[in-house]
Amino acid sequence: MKFGIVARRDREEALKLAYRVYDFLKVNNYEVYVDEEAYIHFPHFSSEDVLSLKKMDVDMIIAIGGDGTVLRVEHNTSKDIPILAVNMGTLGFLAEIEPAETFFAISRILEGDYFIDERMKIRVFVEDVSIPDALNDVVILTSIPGKVTHLKYYVDGELAEDIRADGLIISTPTGSTAYALSAGGPLVDPRLHAILLVPLAPVALTARPLVVPDCSSIEIEVLTEREIVLTVDGQFYTQLPSNLKIRVEKSPRKTKFVRFSERIYPKYTLKIKKKF
C-alpha cells in the first residue's frame, strides 16, 4: 500500500505529526511520499520521497490540517484518491479523526478496518469551458464591494429566480456547512443527492435558498454590466466579464474519504453548534 502525506504548512504541530506518520510508515516498510510544500517548511523528510501533489500516485493520502488542507489535496491531485483527514484546523468539518487518534486510525487502515465515504462534487462551465470541480461550493460574487450584481438562474431550462444580490452560492450537501450555511442556507445531510442555490444578501426578501436534485442542470445568466468574481472551494479564483452564461451540474468525479463509522450524528451537528 502506498501513502501520500500532506500537512498544513503554517502549523508546526501539523508538520511534526506528518513527520511522525512518515517515520512510522517507513519503519514498517510502506512506500510513502510527502507533499513538497510540507518538505519546504519542514525539511526533515528524505528528499527522495518528496513529490508534488499533482504527481502523487498513491492508494491513500493522509491530510493533516483543516478543511483548507483537504480542499488543497482535492484541487491538486489528478485521481480520486481516498483521503484520511486529520483535524488540525479550526473546526474540521471534513475531518474524520483528531490528532491523538492518528496512529490508532492508521493501524486500523493497515488491517483493512475502514470504509470509503464518497461525496458528490459539482462541475462548472463558463461559456462551455470547464474549470475545476468543487467539493464544497462555487460562488459568483460582485467584483466591487457594495455594488450588487444582477443574476437570473434556471433549473433544467425553467426560470427559478431573478435576483439582485451580492452574489450566489451553488453548493453540494458537503458544502452546506461552509459558506452556504453562513449565508442562511439550510444544513443538508451529506448523504442526500442535491444541489443548493443560496443568494448572497439579496435585495428582495422573497429570494430564498433553493434545494434541487443533483441531476439538475443549472444555468446562471450574469446580466450586470461589470465584471464578476467566480470562486471554486476558495481555492480557485477568476474574474469574468459581464453578460455571460455559467452552467453548473453534478460532476462525474467524487471525493473519497476514509471513514471508520457510518454514524453521521451527533458529530455532524455538534460541529455546527461549535461553529456558532
Swiss-Prot record:
Cellular compartment(s): Cytoplasm
Catalysed conversion reaction: NAD(+) + ATP = ADP + NADP(+) + H(+)
Record-linked InterPro entries: ATP-NAD_kinase_N, ATP-NAD_kinase_PpnK-typ_C, NAD/diacylglycerol_kinase_sf, NADK
Names of required cofactors: a divalent metal cation
Superkingdom, natural source: Archaea
The keyword Thylakoid belongs to this UniProt entry's keyword annotation: no
Keywords of the record: ATP-binding, Cytoplasm, Kinase, NAD, NADP, Nucleotide-binding, Transferase
EC numbers on record: 2.7.1.23
Alphabetized Pfam families for the sequence: NAD_kinase, NAD_kinase_C
Binding-site residues, NAD(+): 67-68, 72, 136-137, 147, 164, 166, 177-182, 201, 235
GO (cellular component) term, any one: cytoplasm
Enzyme class: transferase
Gene Ontology molecular-function annotations: ATP binding; metal ion binding; NAD+ kinase activity
GO terms for biological process, alphabetical: NAD metabolic process; NADP biosynthetic process
Active-site positions on this chain: D67
Family statement: Belongs to the NAD kinase family.
Known function: Involved in the regulation of the intracellular balance of NAD and NADP, and is a key enzyme in the biosynthesis of NADP. Catalyzes specifically the phosphorylation on 2'-hydroxyl of the adenosine moiety of NAD to yield NADP.
Name the record gives this protein: NAD kinase
Source organism per UniProt: Thermococcus sibiricus (strain DSM 12597 / MM 739)
